[in-house]
């Protein structure tokens, strides 16, 4: 990664232009052509440095329910459990952790009732009964910017 890549990553985290030609505008800011910016973004995506470019929305204000789930999954069931959980498009994150509760994942769905239904389905499909439903009571921070300079 060179200085232009780092500058590009800094810009697109929170300063992505909402215009007809955002990559052109990024190029102007970074003294590059639109095509060079597009080439760099594609390369950074291929390398897995950029996962996605898109908006972040306040799910609560849009009427969605969210929760953090912690599951106690026996080692021999981990693969199946992960596959079942990942089938749900409402799952936004899914992590293996070194803890008694070793799988942690988040749900964002139309209602908390729907989340409970999905959790019941996951329990039935995997045989894992110990899944904690930990909805947030208060959000203290949800944004992170990585300063790459």
Language-model segments: which ranges?
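A compositional/biophysical signature of low hydrophobicity enriched in polar/charged and small residues
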Residues: 1-149
């Amino acid at each position: 990664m060179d200085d232009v890549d780092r500058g590009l990553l800094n810009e697109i985290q929170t300063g992505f232009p909402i215009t007809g030609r955002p990559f052109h505008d990024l190029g102007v800011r970074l003294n590059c052509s639109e095509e060079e910016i597009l080439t760099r973004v594609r390369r950074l995506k291929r390398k897995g440095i950029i996962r996605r470019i898109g908006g972040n929305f306040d799910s609560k204000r849009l009427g969605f329910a969210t929760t953090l789930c912690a599951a106690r999954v026996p080692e021999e069931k981990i693969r199946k459990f992960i596959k079942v959980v990942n089938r749900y498009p409402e799952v936004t994150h899914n992590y293996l952790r070194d803890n008694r509760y070793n799988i942690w994942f988040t749900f964002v769905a139309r209602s908390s009732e729907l989340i409970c239904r999905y959790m019941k389905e996951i329990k039935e499909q995997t045989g894992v009964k110990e899944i904690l439903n930990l909805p947030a009571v208060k959000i203290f921070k949800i944004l992170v910017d990585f300063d790459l300079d």
